[in-house]
Amino acid sequence: MPRSPFPVLVTSVNQRYLEQTKHQDIPGILLQLDFQRAFDTIEWKFIQNVIAFFNVGESIQQWISTFYSNIQSSVLNNGFSTNYFALSRGVRQGCPLSPFLFVLAVELLACKIRQDKEIQGIKIFRKELKISQFADDTILLNNNRNSVGRALNVLDNFGNLSGLRLNSSKTKALWLGPWRHCKETPFGFQWPEKPERILASYVSYDVKQNEKLNFETKLQKMQSIFDVWNCRNLTIFGWCLIAKSLGIAQLVHTISILNISKAYIRTVNSTIFKFIWKNEKDKIKRRVMISDCDEGGLRAPSIEIMVKSMKLAWDP
């Protein structure tokens, strides 16, 4: 099953806005929201109202109501179970329906923030961005403090209705553009000076540090995978397959978001072909290796082609 492109798009858009606020000298504040036990606290009554609001169909509403009505649970501890007690909040872990119900619920928050004229996002290339979401990961972009205050009021009201509460002490914030050197730490949030992770990728103004943090860890993981397979006895086709399916796959998400320098491209290529040729000198030219089999090649992975294809596929 192919992975969803949405985490790639969310992180890519945030990184793009981060870079443009610096280049165009646009002030702003980025908030990485943290909800307290998000999937465990959302109210069932709120979910039912959301389903009715989006009009998903009477049949689906009835099925969901059946799954989330008059539910009781018991806790098993050291072989002893407690009395049954009623449940009225939270979506079930492991249930394939749970992510969709949660996403529908938090979509109301996104709609409210986008429609509120007092909440001003960051406008770049005539496009204003206020909020980006993936599951319970929510990023807010504001261009002034008053806008942040208004957004927090909306979050409080949403929490009163839905049960989702903002954890201010774990919410992280970042000054953007000309404010990036500001030392103030308002609103009770964390204001880290080091690069922060958003959806498994580091995001920061320092391009070199950003590249180092994101790519070096992936390269180390790729090398560790190759080390495990080095003791196997495979054909040249097998080595190429492992390099492509297990090794270079480690870089897909990061390459989709960030630009990779020529130095790292050379490092990746060197690592791949050293693995294929068992640390010996290349016996076949690499341009031949990456060609299709009907052209005399082995379809070995090409990091250059991968970079171009990923940028073409995911560039928002």
Regions found by a protein language model. Give the residues of each.
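Active-site palm subdomain of RNA-directed nucleic acid polymerases
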Residues: 23, 104-135
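Extended C-terminal regions of large enzymes
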Residues: 268, 281-316
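Catalytic palm subdomain of template-directed nucleic-acid polymerases
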Residues: 38-54, 132-160, 177-178, 207
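Conserved pre-catalytic core of RNA-dependent polymerases
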Residues: 1-108, 272
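Active-site-adjacent bridging/hinge elements
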Residues: 72-86, 218-225, 278-286
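Basic, alpha-helical interaction scaffolds
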Residues: 187-262, 266, 277-280, 309-316
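Inter-domain linker/hinge segments that demarcate the starts of reverse transcriptase
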Residues: 10-22, 50, 147-162, 219-224
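Short, conserved micro-motifs composed of acidic
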Residues: 79, 166-195
